[in-house]
């Protein structure tokens, strides 16, 4: 029985789809003005694991994740680069897809772009105006009338009265109320714009997601996700817009993943304390980064540090060493392990608990390989199958154990040195054998001499 924590109700609930076995999920994606940082990677990986588990449980899932390809940040960066905004966004979208592929993230079923849904935004905004939830003051802008929506604040548990304290209308804004937010922005010189019933302009951020989600999934759908920094105001405003426009409940369940922190602060571009996924992958294998992101529960914050990445590498080394050198086999039934893994994942996608079960499996594989190689191989196959539901442990063990972060060690050179060492040992030239081992150690290579010969891996 799958249970998920719903930010809307602030409780863990038994998950029941709105329609039969169909699950429709929308997740807020990237604003594509720069390379993805590790905080974006956290959300990508979290909802990738959720996608994998929902499908494993037999749900007919439609997963939609949008791309925000018009925004103040995009315009500013394009101006800084002296390039058209769409040239910038195309480059960043391609880079995002490359990062995702390296982190073994499955593609969403649909990836709508904001600029492809301008007409739908016009239609929803006009509906809101017709219903009295929005107004056009005549300066090219259109605002949402927050005070008219009775349910405002129900997601974030904020009270309108409290929000008004200290709120003010900025110069140039034509709001009726400081809390009102923009749906359509009148055109400014030098900015991209689209024609509309209210003049040239471009959409506000919040209306983009309301339109893309309902266009792809319908007025009401099962799951809306994103980082917990989006809960307010973005997701709160989405609810206000969508439910006012359609007259129906918007998303049934809201899932929010925790942030990546550095010294207790959220990793973000605005704070300047971020590392791009690409920068981290220059030092660490992609699977190490993915494991770091799944080793904690998706709602918990993750503190970024070199120590935590080294621990993730060490954990994967233990797993792959357990899988190494075993023959192919059909997965063992391993009912107890399978049931406990499923129980963890059914408990609000508790990947930390699921990883604990995988460690127990790995220990049992290591115990069995000394006495019953076929049983060890079958259990290892089950370990690999379960880990695959988290998107890890799918490489050949030797390939992972011998892989640097971007090929920092030349495998051919290592193999040649190992062969030279074997020849030195055969000739009883122990001094040369020790010299070669010391050279390999200095390269970060660990040798393991066994009955089947010498294997190697990179040091933790």
Curated annotation (Swiss-Prot):
> What broad class describes the main subcellular location of this protein?
cytoplasm
- Return the broad EC class: ligase
Please give the Pfam families that the UniProt record associates with this protein.
CysS_C, DALR_2, tRNA-synt_1e
Cofactor binding remark: Binds 1 zinc ion per subunit.
Motif 'KMSKS' region: which ranges?
266-270
State the HAMAP family in the record: Cys_tRNA_synth
**Cofactor (UniProt):** Zn(2+)
Query: Disulfide bonds, which pairs?
Result: none
Q: Which family does it belong to?
A: Belongs to the class-I aminoacyl-tRNA synthetase family.
Query: What's the protein called, per UniProt?
Result: Cysteine--tRNA ligase
This enzyme's EC code(s)? 6.1.1.16
What residues does Zn(2+) bind to? 28, 209, 234, 238
> What is said about its interaction partners and assembly?
Monomer.
* Compartments, as annotated in UniProt: Cytoplasm
GO cellular component, alphabetical, reads: cytosol
* MF terms (GO), sorted A to Z: ATP binding; cysteine-tRNA ligase activity; zinc ion binding
| Protein species of origin | Pseudomonas aeruginosa (strain UCBPP-PA14)
Q: Its Gene Ontology biological processes? A: cysteinyl-tRNA aminoacylation
Catalyses which reaction?
A: tRNA(Cys) + L-cysteine + ATP = L-cysteinyl-tRNA(Cys) + AMP + diphosphate
Q: Which residues bind ATP?
A: 269
Matching CDD domains, A to Z?
A: Anticodon_Ia_Cys, CysRS_core
Motif ('HIGH' region) spans which residues?
30-40
- Keywords, alphabetical: Aminoacyl-tRNA synthetase, ATP-binding, Cytoplasm, Ligase, Metal-binding, Nucleotide-binding, Protein biosynthesis, Zinc
């Amino acid at each position: 029985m799958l249970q998920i924590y719903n930010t809307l109700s602030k409780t863990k609930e038994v998950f029941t789809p709105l329609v039969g076995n169909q699950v429709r999920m929308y997740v807020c994606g990237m604003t594509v003005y720069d390379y993805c940082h590790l905080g974006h990677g956290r959300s990508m990986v979290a909802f990738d694991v959720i996608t994998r588990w929902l499908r494993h449980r037999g749900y007919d899932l439609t997963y939609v994740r949008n791309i925000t390809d018009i925004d103040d940040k995009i315009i500013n960066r394009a101006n800084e680069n002296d390039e058209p905004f769409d040239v910038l966004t195309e480059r960043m979208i391609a880079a995002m897809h490359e990062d995702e592929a390296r982190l073994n993230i499955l593609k969403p079923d649909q990836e709508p772009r904001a600029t492809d849904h301008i007409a739908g935004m016009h239609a929803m905004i006009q509906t809101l105006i017709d219903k009295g939830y929005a107004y056009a003051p005549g300066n090219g802008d259109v605002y949402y009338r927050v005070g008219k929506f009775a349910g405002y604040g129900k997601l974030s548990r904020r009270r309108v009265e409290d929000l008004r304290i200290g709120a003010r209308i900025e110069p140039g804004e034509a709001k009726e109320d400081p809390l009102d937010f923009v749906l359509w922005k009148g055109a400014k010189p030098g900015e991209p714009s689209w024609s509309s019933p209210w003049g040239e302009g471009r959409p506000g951020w919040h209306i983009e997601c309301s339109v893309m989600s309902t266009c792809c999934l319908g007025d009401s759908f099962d799951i809306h996700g994103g980082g917990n920094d989006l809960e307010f105001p973005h997701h709160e405003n989405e609810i206000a817009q969508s439910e006012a426009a359609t007259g129906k409940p918007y998303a049934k369940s809201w899932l929010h993943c925790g942030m990546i922190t550095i010294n207790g602060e959220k990793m973000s571009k605005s704070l300047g304390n971020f590392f791009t996924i690409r920068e981290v992958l220059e030092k660490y294998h992609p699977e190490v980064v993915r494991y770091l992101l799944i080793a904690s529960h998706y709602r918990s914050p993750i503190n970024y540090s070199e120590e935590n990445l080294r621990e993730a590498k060490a954990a994967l080394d233990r797993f792959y060493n357990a899988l190494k050198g075993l023959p192919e086999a059909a997965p063992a039934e391993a009912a107890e392990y399978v049931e406990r893994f499923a129980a963890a994942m059914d408990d609000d996608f508790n990947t930390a608990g699921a990883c604990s079960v995988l460690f127990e499996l790995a220990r049992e594989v290591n115990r069995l390989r000394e006495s019953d190689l076929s049983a060890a191989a079958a259990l290892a196959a089950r370990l690999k199958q379960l880990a695959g539901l988290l998107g890890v442990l799918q490489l050949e063990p030797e390939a992972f154990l011998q892989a640097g972060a971007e090929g920092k060690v030349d495998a051919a050179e290592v193999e040649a040195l190992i062969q030279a060492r074997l020849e030195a040992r055969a000739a009883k030239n122990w001094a040369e054998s020790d010299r070669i081992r010391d050279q390999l150690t200095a390269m970060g290579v660990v040798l393991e001499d066994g009955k089947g010969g010498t294997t190697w891996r990179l040091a933790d």
